[in-house]
Amino acid sequence: VFEEIEKPIISVVEKMNKMGIKVDKKILKDLSLKYHQELARLKTVIWEEAGEEFNINSPKVLSLILFNKLNLGDKRQKKTPTGAISTRESELEKLRDKHPIIGMILEYRELSKLLSTYIDAIPPQLDKNYRLHSTFILAGAATGRMASNSHNLQNIPNKTVLGRAIRTAFM
């Protein structure tokens, strides 16, 4: 396996690591503007639905709004170790049809994550040629497949339309 498969690809992987991947900074800048605007819009609408301004990013505060003020939970909802009703994505998905605020909160979280982890985080990490460098590791995973770290390019989202838009910046 090493002689026939892994050895011939070592030089290719080294070249990939050294060269990096070209990133279209303008696409990320445009996405940043668009997603920040949508985040601000969602925040306003969520506050309107809740009837008050609150920290959407605080699970504790969000739990109070959703389950105490809006009475959206039931006894089957999972609780956190502190006894608060969980606001994890999997728990909120179960409530999506109960109130429009749930879908808005899930979208708000997705946008916030994409902005902080990818869209706004990648540009400062680009080299002078607008390339992002990663370290690809042959047989880096337990299954034998290649792994990537120090900018894990295998983690760029692809399950949602919002996430897939980020991939268009990679050339």
Model-derived regions: residue spans:
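Conserved "right-hand" nucleotidyltransferase catalytic core of DNA-directed polymerases
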Residues: 1-162, 171
